[in-house]
Amino acid sequence: MKRPVTGKDLMIVNMGPHHPSMHGVLRLIVTLDGEDVVDCEPILGYLHRGMEKIAENRAIIQYLPYVTRWDYLATMFTEAITVNGPEQLGNIQVPKRASYIRVIMLELSRIASHLLWLGPFMADIGAQTPFFYIFREREFVYDLFEAATGMRMMHNFFRIGGIAADLPYGWIDKCLDFCDYFLTEVIEYQKLITRNPIFLERVEGVGIIGGEEAINWGLSGPMLRASGIPWDLRKVDRYESYDEFEWEIQWQKQGDSLARYLVRLSEMTESIKIIQQALEGLPGGPYENLESRGFDRKRNPEWNDFEYRFISKKPSPTFELSKQELYVRVEAPKGELGIFIIGDQSGFPWRWKIRPPGFINLQILPELVKRMKLADIMTILGSIDIIMGEVDR
């Protein structure tokens, strides 16, 4: 980082990696002129675990539990992208019931992620009270996850060709009750937060990003939609069964922190609409395509013989990836989550490249905070919505 040549004494401040407003182990080296930010340099890598290299040394079935550690607050999306790639490579058809259940789980995960963004974001800018209301609703979502998957976080629920298990008895009614209840709570958030003059003073006109600038920086998700670009991969790519439901892309024109807040708040309402339609139209049939278990059993065939069944540990079955390249993407809560896969006719991917939305959205932070006040760093960083497990991988 080059120190600006001025006649003033500048102060260099280290924020993080343990600062509570960093949302993980992010470190910012901030150069200050009084209260004004002159420069900002993010330091990444504190949570790097080599997720891409791990993927290249594991079968897809073995790697599924790992992917929930990318964005550990929206794990359904990392699972979806991990199984969607092999499904497209192998031309595997997902049963309609499994696709609907996937949509329900993805939208519940989107709501949980936005709630977990909103609570700490409000706490960062000094509003502690909404934090407790918001986490109350988040616990209801986690109760639904626990009933369906057995886990409140790190669900490991998606499988190649379907899902791990069908919905338990009474779960649909419980989820519909939550949808009705949550819509009233969103109205309460609007009364408590959106109309609060102190909140508006902190976020309105702070961290403005224009539409063309957002595209040039490669931003996605609420960061892009808050800048006047109505781009949502659920409408563009029509993956899973999203084209069978009626919902609208939520976007704003202002491009500031308030616009990003409004986009995420209205997205939760749209997610409830999608969940209600999916629950009411949930078809019957299987929840998994059993033909997808065309596993690669040709290795060491002698160990599958009758004589060895009691004395040998059989190798776990693997899904064979055909020799081709593929880029798959989904609309995660933070933006476009994608993976680039290269198969080489084996159970392991030859290359597994992750496109994390948080990492790419974080690039614009130094540009946004320059010439702003020190206190605005919390507002701008919070409005970007990052999780360092996904940024560092």
Curated annotation (Swiss-Prot):
It is an enzyme of class 7 (translocase). GO terms for biological process: photosynthesis, light reaction. It is a peripheral membrane protein. PROSITE patterns: COMPLEX1_49K. SUPFAM superfamilies: HydB/Nqo4-like (SSF56762). Its main location: plastid. Its EC number is 7.1.1.-. Keywords: Chloroplast, Membrane, NAD, NADP, Plastid, Plastoquinone, Quinone, Thylakoid, Translocase, Transport. InterPro entries: NADH_Q_OxRdtase_suD, NADH_UbQ_OxRdtase_49kDa_CS, NDH1_su_D/H, NiFe-Hase_large. Pfam families: Complex1_49kDa. It catalyses: a plastoquinone + NADH + (n+1) H(+)(in) = a plastoquinol + NAD(+) + n H(+)(out); a plastoquinone + NADPH + (n+1) H(+)(in) = a plastoquinol + NADP(+) + n H(+)(out). GO terms for cellular component: chloroplast thylakoid membrane. It is found in: Plastid, Chloroplast thylakoid membrane. One of its GO terms (molecular function) is NAD binding. Belongs to the complex I 49 kDa subunit family. NDH shuttles electrons from NAD(P)H:plastoquinone, via FMN and iron-sulfur (Fe-S) centers, to quinones in the photosynthetic chain and possibly in a chloroplast respiratory chain. The immediate electron acceptor for the enzyme in this species is believed to be plastoquinone. Couples the redox reaction to proton translocation, and thus conserves the redox energy in a proton gradient. PANTHER family: NADH DEHYDROGENASE [UBIQUINONE] IRON-SULFUR PROTEIN 2, MITOCHONDRIAL (PTHR11993:SF10), NADH-UBIQUINONE OXIDOREDUCTASE 49 KDA SUBUNIT (PTHR11993). NDH is composed of at least 16 different subunits, 5 of which are encoded in the nucleus. This is NAD(P)H-quinone oxidoreductase subunit H, chloroplastic. It comes from Arabis hirsuta. The lineage of its organism: Eukaryota, Viridiplantae, Streptophyta, Embryophyta, Tracheophyta. The gene is ndhH.
